[in-house]
Amino acid sequence: CFFIDAINPDGTLEERTYDRLGRVIRRLTPFTSALERLRPRLEARCGLYFSMESCVNPALDGVPLRLLNEGSSNMGIRCNPLADEVSATAELLTRMKIPYRILTDRTEDWSGLDAVIVNNARYLSPDECARMREFVRDGGTLIATGMSSLQKRDGESSGNFQLADLFGVDFTGEFTDTVSYLKTPEEGLTACLNNRCPLVRVRDAELLGTVTVPDYPANDPERYASIHSNPPGIDTGFAGLTLHRFGRGECVYLYSTLLRHRNASQREFGERLFRRFVPGALRSNLPPSAEVTLLRAEDGTLVVAVVNDQEDPPNIPLFDVEIEIPCAPVQSVRRVSDGKPVPVMMRDGKLLLNLERLDDVEMFEIIQQ
């Protein structure tokens, strides 16, 4: 939990905030004590790649700092396309109950991962690209979007993706306008807004979807097909979604940053994409707002954390919760909140966890045989 000091206008501390903080800490004590004792690490088959070097706005390149005014204080909300797409992808994985862990350029151990998602990582080093190639060559699945790997960290570029051989597509040097659509047989048309996306041609990848653009420039005041929107018009034939086999693995390339949009149609597209290419989803009857995290301690203990994370407090309790977790035969299960044992129920190589009621949070310690 994170609290900022609560100070009244007269300079005194707001005692009710600290009373609330104390109640939260006391309620979390069984869980924090278990984590301190076990010191587990995230258990996941999916990796989400975050490129700090790519968190830039190329449109501001060359603008003197004295002229750069974002119009916001240090407490304001800023927009960063890459961070927005990574966080939206993380939300989608959480909604789908797909455990994941964050990867960066400093993460050398990719063991245990079956799929890695790279969101619009424009600036990648040769070492990062080599690690991604090796991952796919050895049987992994890479999902890359947008401008990923177009330039090295110093900005140098050949004009094509560094990972063009892995993607199976080539960058044409051209971009869409700020509105474009992905056209696929399954989803029809899915919009990407407020971003110019690269136009690419298939080299030797399988074409899963193409790029459709409006008939006229976005938001043109004189030429338009609709006065209040930019509807799809021309199917360009450029590759929008592709699948490329590489070594023993495969690479999915998505031309746009539509995963950053948190609207229903874009989320539905992302869910279909991840269900097809990202393994490790847990079966449960939990709503999208609930989170499930898997952790593994050094002694082999599996820790399952379930959080009822509704947007508007207080949480509405969830009843008759069921979760299925693929795992080896289990010796015992203990509920962390009260330390009581839980009956072990296995079915088809999966552990079945049941909760009669989930208010806010619960954890389980699972000892495997």
Language model segments and positions:
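Carbohydrate-binding surfaces of carbohydrate-active enzymes
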Residues: 1-369
